[in-house]
Design a protein with these regions (language model features):
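Alpha-helical transmembrane segments and their membrane-interface boundaries
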Residues: 1-293, 298-341
Length: 341
């Protein structure tokens, strides 16, 4: 059995087609965000980003199969974002967000597990809901949220399928779906969905109850280890999350300290997501070095009133809280006959 230490430092080969995926993701994120900068509505960037995350799905499929997969994933992201915007209008949003985030985690995890989504799990749906719900909003913000996230998701589907006509003309066969990227395909969808829901709710209660500024990062981090089902793999993924996040916080501090123009921030954010797609299949910690500054740049762009040091500190602390809770849930609910790591 490969040791935990070896798994932590293993760098796998670049997956086939990763460069094209990165380009599609980069363009899908860049264009909607630049449009918002141009019309002077950077406060809507969260809605656009989460719609654009539709481009992360369906990479292993072509033609109609990709459209269907991205359409389903996009609908889940649109729904999560709109739910977040609704909760954001409530004066009790901090506590209301916890059970709703748990429900989002359960439903998205089950659908992902049942249909073999890549990337797996409910990470992006929980992220979309909880991040949007954390920013105070008015009822008048609901229409922009619905319009922006929907158009952004549709644009991502368009970008992801522009080559379909060429492939069909060349009679390119649909590739066989690859193995599950982090642990293999599994049955028992409701068990894994319940794990995610429990982890999200527990992390939300602890982070919110302790008065930390942005509890949604703890909820998102709790999902991360539970995206795979073997506890040794969960431990490696959790450690990757913490290690990569803390290195990424240094990168984020350097970028945020520069006080860059909004358009420059958008280009950097899209490029960071593209780099993420190039390295996430090789080593998850590498991906977090890109994801962490990306997330912080977008949050700061949408809500620039948050002090940078507070933003960085909350991210680090909540990541540790969330990963710890996710690992505890994974360990407590592991199969009784599971081999020790």
């Amino acid at each position: 059995m490969t040791s935990i230490g070896q798994r932590l430092v293993t760098v796998r080969p670049l997956p086939p087609g990763a460069a094209w995926v990165a380009v599609r993701v980069w363009f899908s994120i860049l264009v909607p965000l630049l449009v918002l900068v141009a019309i002077d509505h950077v406060e809507w960037t969260l809605y656009a980003v989460f719609g654009a995350f539709t481009s992360l799905y369906g990479r292993e499929r072509v033609d109609l199969h990709r459209i269907v997969r991205q359409g389903a994933a996009g609908l889940s992201l649109i729904t999560a974002t709109i739910l977040g915007a609704l909760v954001a209008t409530s004066s009790a949003r901090e506590w209301l967000a916890i059970p709703v985030a748990g429900a989002v985690a359960v439903v998205a995890s089950y659908v992902s597990e049942s249909h073999g989504w890549i990337p797996p799990g409910s990470l992006f749906q929980v992220f979309a809901f909880a991040a949007v719900a954390s920013v105070p909003a008015e009822a008048s913000d609901l229409v922009p949220a619905i319009v922006v996230v929907t158009l952004s998701a549709l644009f991502a589907v368009l970008v992801g399928n522009v080559g379909a006509v060429v492939r069909r003309a060349r009679r390119t066969a649909d590739p066989a779906p690859p193995g599950h990227p982090i642990g293999g395909a599994h049955s028992g969808g409701w068990l894994y969905a319940a794990q995610s829901g429990i982890g999200v709710i527990a992390a939300g209660l602890i982070a919110t109850g302790s008065g930390i500024g942005r509890p949604y990062w703890a909820m998102v981090s709790a999902v991360v280890p539970l995206m795979t089902h073997d506890f040794a793999a969960q431990l490696v993924r959790g450690l990757h999350r913490v290690i990569g996040t803390f290195i990424g916080l240094g990168v984020a501090w350097l970028l945020l300290d520069l006080d860059l123009a909004d358009a420059v921030v958008v280009v950097i954010a899209a490029t960071l997501q593209a780099f993420t797609e190039l390295v996430i299949g090789r080593n998850y910690a590498f991906a977090l070095i890109c994801i962490t500054p990306l997330a912080l740049l977008i949050v700061h762009l949408a809500a620039p009133v948050i002090p940078i040091n507070e933003l960085l500190g909350d991210r680090g602390l909540e990541t540790v809280i969330g990963v710890t809770i996710g690992l505890l849930v994974g360990y407590a609910t592991r199969p009784r006959n599971a081999t020790r790591a």
